[in-house]
Amino acid sequence: EAAFVANIKHCVKASLLAMKAILDLRPDAIFIFSESTEYVHPGSPDMVQQAHFMNEQRFLSLDLLFGHDVSATMYRYLLASGMTQEEYLWYRSQSDLRRHCSMGTDYYITNEHIIRSDGRSIGAGDVYGYYVITRQYFERYRLPVMHTETNRVSKHAVEWLWKEWMNLLRLREDGVPIIGFTWYGLVDMKDWDTALTKIRGSINPVGLYTLARKPRKVAREYRRLVEEYSALPISSSKFPILTA
């Protein structure tokens, strides 16, 4: 736990200091911070408390980044894991930087988990889906949202593309300021299935294009989506429409 908290606090501090340095030169800079939007479901009655803890813990990096106050449980956890009160108060004092930020939300079929009584975690699929989980993040931080990452393997890609887009439109209709949507990545990945922990050279067909630069069906659908919705204005937010 100490290593986890140390990693978060140093990464977030580096981001905050980098933002300040950039803003000194470009006061009009806008930062999009991409985060994996996760959710843990309890797999048995005795795991409800643990799932609740993990669902609070998922916000820690963004809480520190955006100067959002954490719960009493998370505050005790941070102090017990090596963060000092002075450090925590420093992060809270940086909240003025959030006005230069938007929130990037990544969502995949693997983002929801079920934790079992033996402590093991298994995939839950999209029980809640992008809408519900992103809404949780938006209600917490109240920042403009961009769907910064999503994909599925090629045989499920088209259905998944439109499913994510419909979730995004529903958020927009419900008043969440939406500023963008990205399929990740442009081309297929290698060893994506092991998060690069094992180098096998396995090609994962999740891109809009193959590694040979041939478009997949999802690429044509993505182009269709862009063409059909190109007239849709960016949701009302504090950000100007980009012209270049």
Where are these regions (language model features)?
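Active-site region of glycoside hydrolase catalytic domains
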Residues: 1-157, 166-244
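Charged helix-capping and loop-helix junction motifs
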Residues: 162-164
